[in-house]
């Protein structure tokens, strides 16, 4: 390649990565970006696109991982498992939630899990997921449906539950973290 003979350094490799990404060849983009990063691994400007190219090349796996994270986070909430729930939220930003009862949006935290409830879930299932990524692959929106039933503890009345839902996940240095969830009627 003429570019490589003129200049064989990190800028050249970074440019090759960008060109490969523009062509949709994220495997090649990742390969060149890793080579550029090898020149300067500490505070390297070449590090920024590494996760982008990896996520683009592994979009299906990333999507499946996010869907699994959503299910695991929901199970942790239902089971009152603060430790597991904490894996999916960030210390740097809140998880803002809107419930299907149409109340105000609020910050959902480990404190919410410990609250007493006047109902118990009989069943709760998530299904029909779709994953939508931002162009830089650093934000994902999951859309899905939830169904099940719960019983009020004071009256033993069973209520069927069905709603559509969405969540916003942000890629952080500690992994994907949920920033927003909406449970719409």
What are these regions (language model features)?
Residues 3-7, 40:
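Alpha-helical junction/boundary sensor with strong preference for TPR arrays
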Residues 162-185:
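Short beta-strand edge/turn micro-motifs at domain boundaries
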Residues 82-138, 145, 159-160:
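A solvent-exposed, acidic/Ser-Thr-rich amphipathic alpha-helical stretch
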Residues 51-91:
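Short, low-complexity N-terminal intrinsically disordered segments enriched in polar/charged residues
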Residues 15, 22, 48-49:
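"A position-specific structural signal for the A-helix of alpha-solenoid helical repeats
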Residues 26-44:
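TPR/TPR-like (Sel1-like) alpha-helical repeat modules
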